Amino acid sequence: MTLPVPDVSKNLFDLNGFCSIVTGAGKGIGLTLSKTLAYHGSDLVLVGRSTRELEAAADTIRAIGRKVRTVVTDVTAEKAPEMIVNTAMDMSRRIDVLINNAGSMTFADMLGVDDKIWDDIYSVNVRAPMRIMKAVLKEMVKAGRGSVINMGSSWSSRASVFNQDGGGVDYCSSKAALQALTRAAAQDVAPKGVRVNNIAPGAVDTPMHADHRDLLYQFVKYIPMGRMGVAEDLAGTAVFLASDASTFITGQTIHVNGGMLMVD
């Protein structure tokens, strides 16, 4: 198929008429990205485990003036991909953007990790995004357009999540697997007009880190830009990858980490 060339006389970041799915949308990065997409014109399907959080998030999206549906499910559930796709298609008859944001973080070291820890984190961070992406890509391929954004991590490119003595073999490797999955999936669907990319945040202060924020802030000294990341730092990259501003970009990982990977 002949892929379209963006019309630079128009607002390339305009998402009006889009339908976007965001997993892990009830709080933190997922909520911030959902609001950002809505501000730029997209309708939303919000996916998460907490009815209370999703309803609050949905109220915010409605206040912005966009259509919104919620899907209360664990992303690892067998029927989750079907539920998510059906909800989006029922609302908008199209899916333009998927942000696979839901994730899990644990800190096992190589000698301490066991099968359950390993299987649990890979189920959330790799298997669930793969299954949801597969279901969504079927609709995007039919339409001949769409953008999948996987939420990776800068820790896919370096070891030792929260200390210099090790730890995080499960988390780091799962995010590296997601990064590789992004590239492979992108190659498969690129001829169909569909893009798959990966955002890799560095140290970002979110509710996920509430129990170890003191450890997280030890990393400020390794960030050349001199501060901890926040969810809003990822918003522009997400809109860029969701929009027609990035129609010739696929299979890429964009690190958003204040320059953390520039230094050892």
Regions found by a protein language model. Give the residues of each.
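Substrate-binding pocket helix/loop in short-chain dehydrogenase/reductase
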Residues: 109-110, 114-122, 219
